[in-house]
Amino acid sequence: MSTEFPTKNGINREWHVIDAENVVLGKLASRAAMILMGKHKPTYTPFIDAGDHVVVINAEKVKVTGRKEEDKLYRHFTGYPGGLVEKSLKRVRAEKPTRIVEDAIAGMLPKNKLGKQMYRKLNVYAGSKHPHAAQQPVALTVK
């Protein structure tokens, strides 16, 4: 008797919506990453993308603890000499609030092709409205 692995056709993908208002960023990101990877399912297999879709709303109202608002830095390199750009979490929240949640969740996913596939099932919105009502997402609470 051999182990049966789920196939692409045999995977039932659901949609989940998480309200990020007053939720700690790390707890939100770990819960969303777990759902994107499919670790909440009994058929979880590390080398198969069996995860569900996740919609995060109110990303601009996510909470961070301690002094991270001023101390946490987001860096990217432009490709030019001296082109390392550093922005504080406070500034990133003002310019593009969805990036805070997207980066936190992406950091908890695998760094390979499978991780990119999982990341594509993530949808983050700054406000409380999202265009995925037709998929009938199930509301999730993060403690």
UniProtKB/Swiss-Prot annotation:
Keywords: Ribonucleoprotein, Ribosomal protein. One of its GO terms (molecular function) is mRNA binding. InterPro entries: Ribosomal_uL13, Ribosomal_uL13_bac-type, Ribosomal_uL13_sf. GO terms for cellular component: cytosolic large ribosomal subunit. Pfam families: Ribosomal_L13. One of its GO terms (biological process) is negative regulation of translation. It comes from the Bacteria. PANTHER family: LARGE RIBOSOMAL SUBUNIT PROTEIN UL13M, RIBOSOMAL PROTEIN L13. NCBIfam families: rplM_bact. This protein is one of the early assembly proteins of the 50S ribosomal subunit, although it is not seen to bind rRNA by itself. It is important during the early stages of 50S assembly. HAMAP family: Ribosomal_uL13. Belongs to the universal ribosomal protein uL13 family. Part of the 50S ribosomal subunit. This is Large ribosomal subunit protein uL13. It comes from Solibacter usitatus (strain Ellin6076).
